[in-house]
Design a protein with these regions (language model features):
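Catalytic cores of enzyme domains
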Residues: 1-170
């Protein structure tokens, strides 16, 4: 998180006004009638727009490097060339379930059963599971306030890369 602030400050000092939106006081989570639990800034959506990946059935970002990535963003007033997106505007292009109607491995891996091929990812139910189950376990077992789970992102075809059946889109 501090890296984003450092980059924004450095760009600003160089004459390119910049902010790290997720670090601004106005950043917040909200409940949307249409989308459930949401925030007013999404690092995943910025990564999609920047050409780094598309969304899977679990709502996680599938990148060239798989799902085990972290993104942070800095928005700057600076003229840069546009990065073409290998997947165009298809926000589900690198997910086997959405692209070919096969897979659903992430749904099978979910211990809370909150990902289904019929309805996708229930963010509120996932959030509740993490807060009520995995966070207390991690706190008691490891003494950390981390909010772990992520089982839907491992031991699946898109864990470490774009699935082979979709690789031609890179």
């Amino acid at each position: 998180c501090e890296l984003r602030l450092h980059l924004a400050a450095t760009h600003t000092q160089l004459g390119y006004p910049s902010v790290a939106p997720e670090r601004l006081p106005g950043f917040a989570y909200r409940t949307s009638e249409r989308f459930g639990l949401t925030s007013n800034w999404s690092e995943r959506h910025v990564a999609f727009v920047a050409g780094h990946g598309t969304f899977g059935l679990s709502d996680a970002l599938i990148t060239r490097w798989g799902k085990a990535v972290r993104f942070g963003s800095v928005v700057a007033r600076i003229n840069l060339p546009v990065t073409p997106r290998a997947y165009g505007d298809d926000h589900h292009a690198w997910c086997l379930w959405y692209a070919k109607g096969s897979c659903g491995a992430c749904a099978k891996r979910c211990p809370a059963d909150v990902i289904t091929t019929a309805n996708g990812h229930d963010k509120q139910a996932c959030f509740t599971y993490i807060r009520e189950t995995t966070t207390p376990y991690a706190t008691a077992t490891y003494g950390t306030g981390a909010t772990p789970c992520g089982l839907c992102q491992v031991k699946i075809p898109c864990e470490a890369n774009v699935p082979a059946a979709l690789i031609n889109q890179i």
